[in-house]
Amino acid sequence: MSFLHTHSSECLKSELDFFSLPPTQTSIESSQWIYYKPITSLGDDAPIEFVIPGHGEDYLDLTHIMLSLRIRVETSPLAGGDGDGETSTPGGSAFKVDPVNHLLHSMFNQIDVYFNQKLVSPPNNAYAYRAYIEALLNYSSPAKTSHHLTSCLWDMDTPGLMDALVDSETPNPALVRRARYIHEGHALDLIGHLYCDVFNQDKFLINGVEVRMRLVRSKDSFCLMENTSTSKIRILDASLLVKRAKISPGILLAHARMLSKTTAKYPLTRVEVKTFTIHAGLVGESIDNVILGQLSKRIIVGFVDNRAFNGDRKLNPFNFKNYGINFFSLYADGIQIPSRPLQPSFSRDEPLYVEAYHTLFSGTGIHFLNEGNSISREYYAEGFILFAFDLIAFFLGCTSGR
């Protein structure tokens, strides 16, 4: 039989391979979930701290660390409001309060991770936005509507009604659905994976390393929306679920020999959230030196109301408005990306913004894949305006992956 090409090599179909067996995994003997309780009291606004001791021979599976909370929303009437005079009412029985989307993560504005007392997570005060944007762009509709994201109280807001409270004439249906979970003072349980760089890589953490986590609370005015009351979230119980793996003695000895000569390597994809204030009344703004040093793989830009960002009970913090933007250009090392600036039109009469919308796919590496993010073309202009740019694809001509 002649070959298709002289450089083509011969192969064997797996259907004809009768004499080999699949390999057997022996390096990990077993694993189990361990629950850790916080070492601090669960005060209203106090940070929550966890410590995972590094003693023993078990390794930690960092990708499977999860936070579990049980909370209750307590509501009081605004001074001079229409309340009945009671000082505290279980959430939602007399006053209507709505939790914002992705509540488990919206409750925190910063998460610090320490390995042996050394900070390994970049400091920032916008963790809620990082978690929201990653979930919004990296998961398709099934994960958001019927799978694990609902465990974090993810319920995608209705476009065009992002700020419409439950007691509005036309309320946001997603707010209504989320409000049912805390109606009449019902306790709500939440669980989910934490969006931290060290938890987004596959390597186990070796033994002998103490892990300390510090979770800083967001303002209640940031994660609760309401009109005639002031509510607060009270954390009833908190647990950190950690998967510990028992490693075979041979692997432990081999690792110990290598660690006597060198250090363990943990390559990370670092995610940073940077915030800038654009003053009201300006028709144009140029922001220089946004990133100094190492070039980012990907940049995602969104615009929110400053009051919502800082916590306003009547505004949705995740309402990424278009603000009438008609020109957007990004420069990296003096090179414009893309070569022609984005010039969308968000006019009601003649909306033209498909190139900006398409960046949600080209900028996240899924534009040629059978994947999505549940943001339709119509939804985009009504609270989901994000501009995404894949710099690796531009400079190297290859995708940087998701």
Give residue spans per PLM region:
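Short, low-complexity Pro/Thr/Gly
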Residues: M1-R402
